[in-house]
Each structure stands twice: as structure tokens, then as C-alpha cells.
Amino acid sequence: MSKTLYQKIYDSHIVYEDKKNISVLYIDLHLIHEVTSPQAFDSLRNKKRKVRQPEKTFATMDHNVSTQKRDINASGSMAKKQMQQLIRNCDEFNISLYDINNPNQGIVHVIAPEKGMTLPGMIIVCGDSHTSTHGAFGALSFGIGTSEVEHVLATQTLKQQCFKNMKVEIVGDIPKFVTAKDIILFIIRRLGSSGGSGYVIEFCGNVIEKMSMEERMTVCNMAIEMGAKSGIIAPDETTYAYLKNKIYSPSGACWEXSISYWKTLKSDKDAFFDKCFTIDISNLAPQVTWGTSPDQVISINEKIPHYNEFNSITQKNSAKSALKYMGLNEGAYLTNISIDKVFIGSCTNARIEDLRSASKILKNRKISSNVKAIVVPGSGSVKQQAEREGLDKIFINSGFEWRLPGCSMCLGMNRDQLNIGERCASXSNRNFEGRQGRGGRT
């Protein structure tokens, strides 16, 4: 029987399947952080359970950490408590932790790929919605809730249903100045914020084949913004080259055996997909969101739409509400709207290639004195590499602040936030109301 890539990975991890097609799946890698794990560990203690496979569990601090100084007190009492609990939990249950004093600390979805923890064919889970990032490697990866975090810690398995398959083929020649972020924003605009609901989306096509691993991670990272369970891309030579010689990657004879297996991880030619889309990006311009949903997107040279231009009542009401919250008028150009802050960072766009691209634009230029701008590398390793290349100096000389790794302004959960009414041009993944701080406009 022909299978999609998703079906191959799903089926190979079934431990038990009931008559209602609900499966117990084996989990290869469990990523945890300070926010969604404390209650799970408390429940383990109360039930006198152990972590079943601590060697397949990895932790870091990222959501709450200060990006200005390495001080556990710097983000407030709640953040301090959560970080202290993570240290205690990892020590008690023998889990590897990159805490704020570890030079490699950073965003969990940046660290795992760059260290070679993320491998093709794995099932990877984390108490974070953007776990779909790891799908760029041909892994099945998705976010889970706190009760599920406890279940995986205790059993190294998870109960799941099989989702539908969607194929999004991206074709054409990538125009100048268009990035992977532009491409995925355009796809979200086309398919809608719920267009992927109930599906695992496989991205393919000549555009994907030309992308670097970091670009593919950006695409899969934002599959969740279409409502998808996850996004996934079949591994290829680009994948293997990226993983070779990483700290946690296979080596020696194991490397060759792994390559042989990874080459089987692709959808069969006649595999069935429940939905298929082909999207040509040859004429695409840079994309930017104007509203409060990731599908409220326009090209940089387009006018902000009128809410009556949308088809459904729900879309009209959403657009009307977004225009009011954002303080924007239909028919205006976003290029004429002033901004207060700029954020370069997040698990979507805080890798070394992202920083290189931004630094090229900023070299020998100065930002407005009225704008506060920060760059937050995705990990200690990214920060160190950027500094070796002198990128930090380019950012600082242009007027940006060069920060320490963390989730930072992607979410209003630390000291990096917008004030009420402030506008931010952000490289992150969500533009919800209050996402970057109460009353902030992303």
C-alpha cells in the first residue's frame, strides 16, 4: 500500500492501536521548557512516578529568560519560580538542561536542530505549538498540552489519532528580496488561518528543494498558523549535509545506516492526499501582516483592504475588528505607517542566516532615533557565530540592541514587551491582540 511521509512515520511508531483508530505512539524526543512543564513534574511526584527515558528528554530555558542579563531574578518572581523549578526537576529526574548559565542556552526549537537532536523519521513533541519547526527535517513534530507532557515523561508514549494528509507544492522562481517567511505568509493568506485544521501538511516542490534547512524550518514553523497539526518536508541531500557532524547526529557506521533509512522517508508517488494545492510564487512580493491574524496579509506594495472585500461574515467582522485594534484605515499603505519598535528574533527567524540577511540591509545605515530595535539570537551558538562574523557590530552601529538568546518579544511573557498602542515590525510568528504586550500592535 502506498503511503505519505506522514503515514510512514506515524505507522512505524504505533505501540498499540484500538478499534477506533486511536494509537499509542512512541516518542523519540521530548523537548521541555520552564513554562509548560512544572505541573507535569509535580503530578509525577504525587503519583510517585519516574521519567521513563530521561536520555530522550531535553530541557532549556527560553520563554521567560531576560535577554539583557543572565540573572534568574531579571524577569520577575513568577519567571524566577518557573526557572528554579525546571532546574530542580531536571536535577531530580536526571534530564539534560541548558540553563541560563549554559553558553548554548536558547530557544528550544533552535537548539535541537542545530545540535543534531532533531533527526528524520522521529516523532518529536514539546509543550509549545511551534514544535512543528522540526518537521523541516522529515520528522513528525507537534505541540502538546501539560497533561500530555506528564504522560510522555511517564511513558515515552502518547495517544494520538491519525490526521488527514495535505500536500502544498510550491513552484516557480523565487523573486529577489522574497524570503521563506514571505512564502509561508502568502500560503497562509491563500489557505486561511484554519485552512490546515485537521491536517498534517507536507510541503514540496522545486522551491522547497532549493531552500536551506533554516528556510525550511521557517516554513514548517508557521504551518501551525494555518491550523495544521504539523508541517513536514521530506529529507534530502540538503538535510543530510546540515546534520553531518552535529553533536547529537549519528556518526561512523551509524551515519551510513541512518542515511539509508532517511532516504526511504518520502511520500510514495501514488500516495493519496486528502487535499492538494500548487502555489506559484514567481511573482511574489515581500509580505507583511496588517491585522491580528496570521492570514491577514498583504504584499508590501498593496493597500490595506476594506473589510467588505472579504467573503464571509466571519472574515468581514474579523477584518473590521483588526482594523480598529491596529488603528489602521483601509486603502492606506503600510509603508506609510510609522513604527515604534523592531524585533528580529523568535523560533521563526533568529538563526544565523536570518541575522546575516538582516545585517546586509543594515550595513552602513542608521535606524531612526525614534525607533527602539532589538536583535535576539535564537541560541548561544547563533550568538557566538554572529559575533565571530562581526554581525553584532553591524547591528549595534546601525542602532539596534544586541541581546542574549531567548524567546524575547515574540510573546509578552518576559520584560521585552510593547506598551499600549505601540507598533512593532516583528520577525516572529504571531500577530494576535496583545501577543507582544497588552495593547501592542504587531
Curated annotation (Swiss-Prot):
Amino acids binding [4Fe-4S] cluster: C347, C407, C410
Domain of life assignment: Bacteria
Name of a matching Pfam family: Aconitase
GO molecular function: 3-isopropylmalate dehydratase activity; 4 iron, 4 sulfur cluster binding; metal ion binding
GO biological process: L-leucine biosynthetic process
Cofactors (names): [4Fe-4S] cluster
Catalytic activity: (2R,3S)-3-isopropylmalate = (2S)-2-isopropylmalate
The record's free-text note on cofactor binding: Binds 1 [4Fe-4S] cluster per subunit.
Enzyme Commission code: 4.2.1.33
InterPro entries named among the record's database cross-references: 3-IsopropMal_deHydase_lsu (IPR004430), Acnase/IPM_dHydase_lsu_aba_1/3 (IPR015931), Acoase/IPM_deHydtase_lsu_aba (IPR001030), Aconitase_4Fe-4S_BS (IPR018136), Aconitase_4Fe-4S_dom (IPR036008), IPM_dehydratase_rel_enz (IPR050067), IPMI_cat (IPR033941)
PROSITE patterns reported for this sequence: ACONITASE_1, ACONITASE_2
Keywords: 4Fe-4S, Amino-acid biosynthesis, Branched-chain amino acid biosynthesis, Iron, Iron-sulfur, Leucine biosynthesis, Lyase, Metal-binding, Plasmid
Pathway in which the depicted protein is active: Amino-acid biosynthesis; L-leucine biosynthesis; L-leucine from 3-methyl-2-oxobutanoate: step 2/4
Function: Catalyzes the isomerization between 2-isopropylmalate and 3-isopropylmalate, via the formation of 2-isopropylmaleate.
Alphabetized PANTHER family for the sequence: 3-ISOPROPYLMALATE DEHYDRATASE, HOMOACONITASE, MITOCHONDRIAL-RELATED
Quaternary structure, from the entry: Heterodimer of LeuC and LeuD.
Identification of the protein by name: 3-isopropylmalate dehydratase large subunit
Organism of derivation: Buchnera aphidicola subsp. Uroleucon helianthicola
Gene coding for it: leuC
